[in-house]
Each structure stands twice: as structure tokens, then as C-alpha cells.
């Protein structure tokens, strides 16, 4: 009787650990996907602000590199 109760408890513990581990993997992959989408949206918004890849920014001392306005000397110009 004691052995069967112990086996049931160990079985429940094993199932709980397995379910918890699979939930964390699913959450990590979902978080990675959401971060990728949000990062892409931020890059597109930044590109619109500086006029596109390697475009000139409003300040003549800046240029657009990697979707961000930076100083010309940083851009190699």
C-alpha cells in the first residue's frame, strides 16, 4: 500500500515537472516572436523618421544608418 501511494505521488510530481517545463518553452518561443515583431515595427517607424536607408536627416550633420539618424563622421562620410 505504501509503495503504491509513493509511486502515485512520484508520478504526479513527474507530470507536474514535465508540464511546467513545456509551458516555459512555449512562453520563451512566444516571447521571442513578439520581441521580433515589436523590434521590426520600431525599425520601420525609425526608418520613416529619417527617410530610409542611408538617407539624409533633417540636420545636415546627420545621416540615416541602420534606421537611425547619426552623425556623418559615424556614417563614414
Swiss-Prot record:
Keywords recorded for this protein, A-Z: Disulfide bond, Ion channel impairing toxin, Knottin, Secreted, Signal, Toxin
A Gene Ontology cellular-component term: extracellular region
Entry GO MF terms: ion channel regulator activity; toxin activity
Propeptide feature ranges: 22-49
Keyword Secreted in record: yes
Signal peptide: 1-21
Disulfide bonds: 50-64, 57-69, 63-75
Tissue expression pattern: Expressed by the venom gland.
Main location per the UniProt record: secreted
Protein's cellular compartments: Secreted
Domains: entry comment: The presence of a 'disulfide through disulfide knot' structurally defines this protein as a knottin.
Function summary: Probable ion channel inhibitor.
Family, as annotated: Belongs to the neurotoxin 10 (Hwtx-1) family. 65 (Jztx-21) subfamily.
UniProt name for this protein: U14-theraphotoxin-Cg1b
Organism: Chilobrachys guangxiensis (Chinese earth tiger tarantula)
